From Swiss-Prot:
Protein name as catalogued: Photosystem II reaction center protein Psb30
One cellular-component annotation, GO: photosystem II
Pfam families: PSII_Ycf12
Subunit-structure text: PSII is composed of 1 copy each of membrane proteins PsbA, PsbB, PsbC, PsbD, PsbE, PsbF, PsbH, PsbI, PsbJ, PsbK, PsbL, PsbM, PsbT, PsbX, PsbY, PsbZ, Psb30/Ycf12, peripheral proteins PsbO, CyanoQ (PsbQ), PsbU, PsbV and a large number of cofactors. It forms dimeric complexes.
Role summary: A core subunit of photosystem II (PSII), probably helps stabilize the reaction center.
TM region(s), chain numbering: 19-39
Length: 47
């Protein structure tokens, strides 16, 4: 029982969270560009 719990904890602690957050930040920035273009087109250039 405790081996399974410790394996689960080790799986989460071995994940490199910094890389995940950096990739998430880049993804949000990349997605934000087309969203702004779509809003500009939808509102006829009036933000």
């Amino acid at each position: 029982m405790f081996d399974a719990v410790s394996d689960l904890v080790n799986a989460f602690t071995s994940i490199n969270w910094e890389v995940i957050f950096q990739l998430l930040s880049v993804a949000l920035i990349v997605i934000a560009g087309p969203v702004v273009i779509f809003l500009l087109a939808f509102r006829n250039g009036n933000l």
